[in-house]
Curated annotation (Swiss-Prot):
Residues 63-73, 357-371, 396-426, 605-615, 1325-1337 have a biased composition (Low complexity). There is a cross-link at residue 221 (Glycyl lysine isopeptide (Lys-Gly) (interchain with G-Cter in ubiquitin)). One of its GO terms (molecular function) is structural constituent of cytoskeleton. It comes from the Eukaryota. The gene is MHP1. The modification Phosphothreonine is found at residues 222, 577. This is MAP-homologous protein 1.
Length: 1398
């Protein structure tokens, strides 16, 4: 065929195609080639981007078959292969809309010519078009052949039927009769030049993706896995192209398509449809768990079997055919279409649903669908395929045929099935019928073979290689060369004596089948005739006798063997070998010992099992009738199970894993960590064997580098576990394939509650240092971006979580998703999430808005947004909290909030009305269940945030844990916070790391622990704290722990809290409880406001008198402490009233107005007893338990257990404060006893003093109060004011006033000259220290232990620690420091009061 004919055909818009009928038709017409002779040429192919021009009639490329070069004379076998047949079938299908001219000569079968491909550029007015123009060079046609075997195999339909079929297909694909867009399918097809001498592999047309690739022909099973691992899938073909809108890349029309790119690939449109379907459920969890998408899910599909057959177009999608499409048999007769749905139920047995859904059937790249399509197109190929399946199929032929028929029905006519993923009316993708997330169809199911636990009753006998094997004569060098070293008998003897022979483990089983039945019967009769054992001593003696008897038998056997060897003839003693010296094994070498196990305590494992069996059988004989070994209900300890799992894999147990298992324990394992950062495959297998049967609640793979296969093995052992709850993958590398495996696991693991996918390099993981052998390993492990997980396909994980019903806890720190992915994740994946970790995510304003919207709609209890720049973005969270409060008939369950390192700022004159941080703190008071608050690493909010914290912290009645770490607090701020801590009635944990403490702040913290009855943990930098203050804090913490244990163990529910329980609980109740009965609720609020007004009147009068006394310089230290406490109480009550007014839209009366109305209407003011009768109680405040699974939750005090083995050790620094004059120098035990007695006496005095002043649960004793007032004991009066409720404080003030005593008289300095001189000296020292502190840091204080320079300069003023007056000096120094700090606090309070009155 010359170039003129080609040009003529192009002008007629007809695409020629080589007719391959010469393979089977003997009467095929022949013609001479335009270029006679055998020629070899190289083909040049260029693949520019092709664009269609609608103005000019399109010019199509010629689709010329290259089988003439492939089926060359040098390779006759390729003509008979299935690849050739499939190639011709697919070529007929690709030439669907073209007419085949009859004057094209067929090529010769033995021709070595190649197909040359040229391109002609056709330019139009609107654009440039590039099309392939092929020039074919053929030779003389072969002689006619007889009808043979290929006639029946490759018989094809008649040409008129083929043309009719192709015309129908073209009309179906065409959007209109006048416009045929065939360039979309042609522009991605490429032709390749194949050399005749050394032909490369067959080329096939890749699927229409965004990155066109050409993949060589491989087996369909291997190719489909390799191709889809490295190339993004695309589903813009068939009917789906008409379904998606032009804004397919946008999600809800808000985000561009570029936001969904994952590593350069565009999103899957089916996945976007899937997410849109879930978002249409309007945030209702019931719609996900019990909605229509599960009820109408796709029917179980048959399992897809991959056959090892060749396929040319595995990945080429086939257009869906309409219902009107007719099929024809071999004789051209039409085949009626299959009915839409059967009228009767199926008679076949239903199979279990496989992981592959029907979507996988439509878009699968396996040869099953390809062969099914080819079978429907060409009946003759079906015969040849059936012939090959008998030879090369690896599965069941019946299943293959069933799958092929079902797949062909689904592929060719997807509208016929009622359970299809395609809508019958519009051919749209239906996400409601999905059983597998789009994009995970090709993931193989996770399967793991596990044994029952009692299988490990018998330790499997294994021979484990020695750790120090003996060296042999053969040495293999790294370059592959082999060197043989001849050893002398002396060298061999030395090696045998100095090396071990490995470890023999196992063999402790009691298998009855090992003994014949006759021997068992004889043994039974002998045991029945034998007398029973009298005691354990006789049993032990018998065991010794048995061991001695065995040793005697072994020695006799050895002696007999040596005697036989001596009596044997010489020619039998020696085995002659070629040029090899005789080697004899000495007696020493024959008795070599074996390696010892790495864990010594595992030696008693078998005995423990034997003891358990004996205890279970209650002394009965082990060989009794009906006894089953191993016992079916026997619980084997976890350490033994793991050891035997390792023995099954012929390795010793890994110590890092074995140490985490408590010896002899069968309880559920809270957490199990894989601590080897680069584990081997055998370690993974043994670890997964143990995971599959052990009750592990949480698995940590933090910082472990795995391969995809290793990850599959581990997840396969967890996917079907019933009680597995959490999977932690912090800083674990995951590539694209590993991410898909993880998503598949999440979609299938029904018991999974929590997942941690943190990727933050600064977070440390609990892994070991990698070994040298693991570093030298060449195993290709997963690699990814170690800074964050921004390149992961988060939409795929979103769909996986949504499909399994949601997760309770999700931690994705360092995810850094874009806006579209984040919105999908929050609105779809977190629909059932209660705890969400979003640290290190770089949240934007729009993402914060989406998160706040989700908070209002969800049941979230904990939120971590740490290390995100939230400056100017907190208004969304504030509105979300207010929105949750305003929701009717729903309880606010928010408990945990972390704002760690969020770049928050508070200026000097900001208030909660104009600053978002202060407003959020005030709004958090409405959360009655708030237990955890973290505002660490925000130094810009201090010190101006301290007054707001002081005002609102007492309102947080259920606050359990507070963190303000690394905020560079000043000493005055620390003292103010320490004074407010006792007012937090349930605060158990207070952390203030990163703050340098001076003597005053240390003393204030110690007093805070002493005044509080709930504070048990004070987490500060104790390096700046003197030793005596450390001891006091430890003693006060022990006292509080004892009180908490007493409260837990007590059955009396009427015990009230000792710290402001009445007013605080009442205020919290009024702020948070729903006003179901408006009249009753308003009456409660009015009574509370009246009580607050009366309390503020009395407290303000006392505060005014004490401030006047301070201005005159007559207020003592106890008075200053009481004054600070009263000021904080007054401010807290005022803030509570403001919050009540804000909630009721300022309709309530102010406390002053209420007090005036009460005074005018009723002269008699209610006393303290009547105030106590007005207290409210609510059941809401009783249920305030912490969630144990939270990473930042505090420990719950539980009842003591006799099996508890952990103990808390309180370390003491030195014993310099204890007088050891009468103690021997070397008697350490006696010194410890003295320390314990001293500490116990201190605790006893503290408890007695509390009982004396009415602390704890005892009421106030009026007689003791009168005696204290008469003696002007200011310290005891202060304890009355600090250790009781506000209403009790009011009663104390009224009682003192009735007796004629006033607080400004009691807290006035006494006229003692010695005390006055001491105070004067103290003021001078404090002024000097203040002057020096202006130019130095707090660590340069003379008393501080953190500065060596200050010690050397002030050495003369500090007595030695072993001096008799050291304790008195330190006490005076502490009082002086805290007195100066109290003055600073009172000055600031006075300034704030003056500024508020202006």
């Amino acid at each position: 065929m010359d170039s003129k004919d080609t040009q003529k055909l192009l002008k007629e818009h007809r695409i020629p195609c080589i007719d391959v009928g010469w393979l089977v038709r003997p009467s095929a017409s022949t013609s001479k080639s335009s270029r006679p002779g055998k020629s070899e040429s190289k083909a040049n192919s260029v693949a520019p981007d092709i664009q269609m021009d609608t103005a000019r009639p399109p010019v199509f490329e010629t689709s010329v078959d290259s089988s003439s070069s492939i089926l060359s004379s040098n390779d006759k076998g390729r003509r008979h292969s299935v690849a050739a047949s499939l190639l011709m079938d697919n070529q007929r299908a690709n030439a669907g809309s073209t007419s085949v001219p009859t004057n094209i000569p067929p090529p010769r079968g033995r021709s070595k010519s190649v197909v040359e491909t040229n391109l002609s550029n056709v330019e139009a007015d609107s654009g440039h078009h590039h099309h392939h123009r092929h020039h074919h060079h053929t030779e003389d046609a072969p002689a006619p052949k007889k009808v043979g075997f290929f006639k029946s195999l490759f018989g094809h339909r008649k040409k008129d039927q083929e043309q009719q079929e192709k015309e129908r297909e073209r009309k179906e694909r065409s959007p209109s009769p006048t416009h045929v867009d065939r360039g979309a399918a042609i522009r991605r097809e490429r032709t390749a030049t194949i050399s005749a001498e050394s032909p490369p592999p067959l080329q096939y047309n890749a699927p229409p993706s965004y990155n066109d690739t050409v993949v060589p022909l491989t087996r369909s099973k291997t190719e489909s896995e390799v191709y889809y691992e490295n190339h993004p899938q695309s589903y813009y073909h068939g009917r789906m192209r008409t379904y998606h809108s032009p804004e397919e890349g946008k999600v809800d029309g808000t985000s561009p398509a570029d936001d969904h790119n994952y590593g350069g690939s565009r999103p899957d449109p089916r996945l976007m449809d899937f997410l849109r379907y879930y978002k249409s459920k309007d945030y209702k969890l019931a719609a996900f768990k019990e909605g229509n998408f599960i009820k109408s899910s796709a029917s179980p599909t048959t399992k897809k079997n991959r056959r090892a057959s060749f396929s040319l177009h595995n990945d080429k999608p086939q257009p869906a055919k309409s219902l009107a499409h007719q099929k024809f048999d071999a004789k051209g007769r039409p085949i009626p279409p299959h009915p839409d749905a059967p009228k009767l139920p199926s008679a076949f047995r239903k199979k279990h649903p496989s992981n592959a859904s029907i979507v996988d059937t439509v878009d699968s790249n396996s040869d099953v669908s390809s062969s099914a399509q080819n079978n429907n197109q060409t009946p003759s190929s079906h015969k040849f395929g059936a012939f090959l399946r008998k030879v090369t199929s690896y599965g069941n032929n019946n299943n293959n045929s069933t799958n092929a028929s079902s797949l062909s029905a689904n592929v060719n006519n997807p509208d016929t099935s009622s359970t299809s993923l395609w809508s019958s009316s519009s051919m749209e993708f239906d996400p409601s019928k999905i059983t597998t997330v789009p994009g995970l169809e090709n993931i193989r199911p996770l399967k793991h073979v596990s044994f029952a636990t009692n299988t490990y009753f018998n330790d499997p006998p294994q021979q484990i290689c020695s750790k120090n094997p003996r060296k042999g004569e053969v040495e293999v060098k790294p370059n592959g060369s082999v060197v043989i070293h001849r050893l002398t008998p002396q060298e061999r003897k030395k090696i045998m004596e100095s090396t071990s022979l490995g470890v023999v483990v196992g063999g402790t089983g009691q298998l009855k089948l090992l003994n014949p039945e006759e021997d068992d019967a004889n043994a039974k009769s002998k045991e029945e005739m034998a007398p029973q054992k009298q005691n354990e001593v006789e049993a032990h003696d018998e065991e010794d006798n048995n061991s001695q008897r065995r040793n005697i038998v072994m020695a006799a056997a050895e002696a007999a063997a040596e005697a036989r060897a001596k009596e044997a003839p010489n020619e039998l003693k020696r085995i002659v070998t070629n040029n090899e010296e005789e080697v004899t094994v000495s007696k020493t070498a024959s008795h070599l010992t074996i390696d010892k196990p790495m864990i010594s305590r595992r030696g008693a494992s078998t005995s423990s099992l034997a003891s358990m069996v004996s205890s279970d059988t209650n002394g009965t004989n082990a060989d009794d009738e009906g006894e089953i070994l191993p016992p079916p209900s026997l619980k084997i300890p976890h350490d033994i199970v793991y050891t035997r799992c390792c023995h099954l894999r012929e390795i010793l147990p890994i110590p890092a894993t074995l140490k985490q298992l408590k010896k002899g324990s069968t309880d559920p394992i809270p957490i199990l960590q894989l601590r080897n950062p680069r584990p081997s495959m055998v370690e993974i297998w043994s670890f997964s064997d143990f995971l599959s049967i052990a009750p592990v609640l949480c698995l940590s793979l933090d910082g472990v580098q795995l391969t995809v296969q290793m990850l599959r093995i581990i997840l396969s052992s967890l996917v079907y576990k019933q009680h597995f709850q959490k999977l932690s993958l912090r800083n674990t590398p995951l590539d694209e394939e590993g991410w898909k495996v993880l998503c598949y696991f999440v979609s299938k693991a029904k018991s999974l509650h929590s997942i941690d996918l943190t990727m933050v390099p600064s977070i440390k993981t609990n892994v070991q240092k990698p070994s040298k052998s693991s570093l030298k390993s060449k195993i290709l492990r997963m690699q990814c971006n170690l800074e964050n997980r921004s390149d992961m396909n988060w939409d795929l994980l979103t769909a996986s979580i949504a499909l399994m019903g949601g997760l309770e806890e999700i931690v994705i720190s360092g995810a850094k998703m874009n806006s579209a992915q984040f919105k999908n994740f929050i609105l779809v994946a977190c629909i059932a999430t209660e705890r969400l970790g979003l640290a290190y995510n770089g949240l934007s304003k729009s993402q914060c808005d989406d998160l706040a919207k989700w908070m209002v709609q969800s049941k979230v209890t904990g939120l971590d947004v740490g290390f995100n720049d939230l400056n100017g973005k907190l208004s969304s969270f504030t509105d979300a909290v207010l929105g949750k409060i305003q929701k009717a008939n729903e309880k606010n369950v928010f408990k945990f909030l972390s704002l760690n390192g969020t770049n928050l700022r508070v200026n000097e004159h900001d208030t909660f009305e104009n600053n978002e941080v202060l407003k959020l703190i005030s709004v958090l008071c409405y959360l009655e269940n708030l237990k955890f608050l973290d505002i660490s690493n925000n130094p810009a909010i201090f010190p101006h945030c301290v007054p707001t914290l002081i005002d609102f912290l007492p309102v947080f009645v259920n606050l359990v844990r507070l963190h303000i770490d690394y905020n560079n607090l000043s000493s005055t701020s620390v003292v103010m916070l320490a004074e407010i801590l006792p007012m937090c009635s349930r605060l158990n944990y207070f952390s203030m790391l990163g703050t340098e403490l001076d003597l005053a702040s240390s003393k204030a913290l110690a007093e805070a622990v002493r005044k509080s009855s709930s504070l048990m943990t004070l987490d500060v930098d104790y390096v700046y704290m003197p030793e005596n203050i450390k001891e006091k804090i430890s003693l006060y913490a022990l006292r509080n722990i004892q009180g908490e244990l007493k409260r837990v163990n007590s059955d009396d529910k009427d015990i009230k809290d000792s710290q402001f329980s009445s007013l605080q609980d009442q205020l919290s109740l009024l702020l948070t409880e729903k006003a179901d009965n408006s009249e009753h609720y308003n009456k409660m609020v009015e009574n509370f406001m009246a009580k607050i007004a009366l309390a503020r009147i009395k407290i303000s009068k006392v505060v005014h008198d004490l401030f006047d006394l301070k201005l005159n310089g007559q207020l003592n230290l106890e008075g200053k402490e009481a004054l600070i406490r009263l000021c904080f109480i007054e401010a807290s009550l005022e803030r509570g009233c403001d919050l009540l007014k804000q909630r009721h839209n300022n309709t309530l009366k102010s406390p002053e107005a209420v007090s005036k109305s009460r005074k005018g209407g009723n002269q008699a003011q209610p006393n303290s007893e009547s105030c106590q009768r007005m207290l409210l109680s609510s059941s809401i405040l009783q249920n305030s338990d912490h969630i144990a699974l939270m990473p930042f939750g505090s420990a719950i005090v539980e009842k003591s257990s006799p099996d508890a083995e952990d103990a808390v050790e309180f370390r003491e620094g030195d014993d310099s404060n204890v007088n050891h004059e009468d103690v021997p120098a070397n008697d350490q035990q006696f010194r410890d006893e003295v320390d314990i007695k001293n500490k116990y006496s201190i605790i006893k005095r503290e408890l007695e003093h509390e009982k004396l002043v009415g602390g704890g649960d005892l009421p106030v004793d009026k007689e003791i109060l009168n005696r204290a007032a008469q003696s002007l004991d200011s310290d005891q009066i202060k304890e009355f004011l600090l250790k009781n409720d506000v209403s009790t404080i009011l009663g104390v003030i009224d009682e003192l006033h009735s007796q004629g005593y006033h607080l400004h008289h009691i807290f006035k300095k006494q006229g003692n000259q010695e005390e006055t001189a001491f105070r004067t000296k103290d003021e001078q020292q404090s002024s000097q220290s203040n002057d020096s502190s202006a130019n130095a840091s707090p660590t340069t204080d003379p008393i501080s232990t953190g500065s060596n320079t200050s010690r050397t300069n002030d050495n003369a003023h500090i007595p030695p620690t072993d001096a008799p007056g050291f304790d008195k000096f330190m006490n005076n120094a502490e009082e002086n420091a805290i007195d100066a700090a109290y003055d600073d606090v009172l000055d600031k309070i006075q300034d704030a009061r003056n500024s508020s009155t202006k």
